Each structure stands twice: as C-alpha cells, then as structure tokens.
Amino acid sequence: GVKTSLQGQTNLKNLYAIGETSCTGLHGANRMASNSLLECVVFAKSSAEDIKLNFDYESADIDEWDNSKVITAGENIIIAHNWDATRRLMWDYVGVVRSNDRLNMAKENLKLIYEEVESFYRNFELTSDFIELRNLVLVAKIIIESALARKESRGLHYNIDFPDLNKSAVPSIISK
C-alpha cells in the first residue's frame, strides 16, 4: 500500500490514500482481503477533516503535454496480452505461498514484460488502459522485490524457504 500519515496524506501534496490503497500499519501483515473497513471508515473521516482544514486548492502550473512526437500504436492486443501475462505470473509464482525459486523466475519473466511496456511508454501514445498496465507491472515488480528481500514468513505471506517468523520486529519494506 501507499504509506500515509494518520490523516491519509501521502508524501505528495494534496494526494490522500485511504482503505485498500493505504499502508497505515493498523493491520500489519495479517490483514486479509476485504478486511479494511476500519481503515476505510476511520481514515476517510480523518482525511476529510484534514482536507477541510489544510487542503491547498491552488492548482500547479503544468506544461501542456506535447504528443507531437509520439506514434499512435493501436496495439490493444499487446496491452491485453501483457496484462494477462502479469496477472498469471503473479498468481502462479508470487501467491500467498512462495519460494525464492518461483520469485526469481517471476522477476526474470516480469523483466521482459517491463521492458516491452517501458518501450511503448517512451514511444507511443498513452491511453488509460496502457497507463493502468504500466502501473500494474510496476506494482508487481515492487511486490516481487519486497518478497525476495524478506527472509521470513509473516502473517499470510509464507515463503517455504523461510518458514519461520523472525522474532525480532522487522520494519515494513518500503520501495520507491
């Protein structure tokens, strides 16, 4: 999730994250799917109060997007294929029960998808579907790197190569 303050504020001015998106530390590694009601309700109220008091409504000066040098790709099949390949890769290799061998295979396979997506990102017209795909691939990359960095099993994240919980508290892995 996205690291936030207790008001849901991220490190980007005026950008808040609440619920499934946020990383607040309320539930730790054992928060199961659809169990973020506490974060949704509490942080929504806290964020709303913070926005009401502190939100800067001035918009930033942003240069117009220059797409004169980009090519219209018209390659929806590439988006669909890479989306499906990333989804299957994460399901098959980076599920709840993991091994370092599968994580490393996932990392290598995702590298090919990432390189193709980045090539399109630099040279072709962007669509919302393509931007979602790029974000999906980047998040998958961060998840794999974080799973490889953790040398223990904690909560619902189980690595058969490191089946035991490290008794000393290990801070959350934060990736930039």
At which residue positions do the language-model features occur?
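Glycine- and aromatic-enriched mobile tails/lids
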Residues: 2-17, 21-176
